[in-house]
Amino acid sequence: LSVARGNYFLTLLSAFLITIILLIGFVVSDTHILYGVFIVLIGIVLLRLFKINLLSFKKLTMSQVIYIIGGALLIYGLDYLYLHFHDVPTNEQELDRELQHMPLYMSIVTIAIIPAIVEEIVFRGMIIRVVFRKHLFIGLVVSSLVFASLHESDTWIGYLPYLYSGVIFGLIYLKTKRLEVVILIHFINNLSSLLILLWG
């Protein structure tokens, strides 16, 4: 399941550089959408230049499409159960306030598309497949915990939706070996949350 065949430490250094660029693009996209998209694209191009093969851009198979649909439905179902017993996470309350002053197209790009691409490349791609490429289960655990911890919550239980989402993304990624699959699941999850916040 290796995505880079070169020296481990050189690959790690390249991955760190690309991660910084992607995260800068992520942050910049909140206020300057075109600059943010451009920076993220630079990060994706650098993946190819440094031969870190996280994205294949091949046509999805039917089984991968089923994983996308199933993964999105599973997360939606778990979110529904969570919200039945707990309040809306702080992170989504913050998003709700931001959306009041943002055009729809900008909301979709900055809340649904860019986070899905950047977070999956960084958390599932870089952490699982680069940092822990010989210890994938440890990578799955670490990536899920870091992914959850970087989202905002006032309570421990508030991190739960991000934790189980991270685990599901990681498991499906390891099963399908296609980062595009979990990017699409993540995008669908973000988009559905966005639409519910806007019109729910």
Task: Enumerate the language-model features and the residues they cover.
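Membrane-embedded alpha-helical segments of multi-pass membrane proteins
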Residues: 34-44, 105, 109, 160-168, ...
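Juxtamembrane helix-loop-helix connectors linking adjacent transmembrane helices
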Residues: 54-115
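Function-critical hydrophobic alpha-helical transmembrane segments in multi-pass membrane proteins
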Residues: 96-152
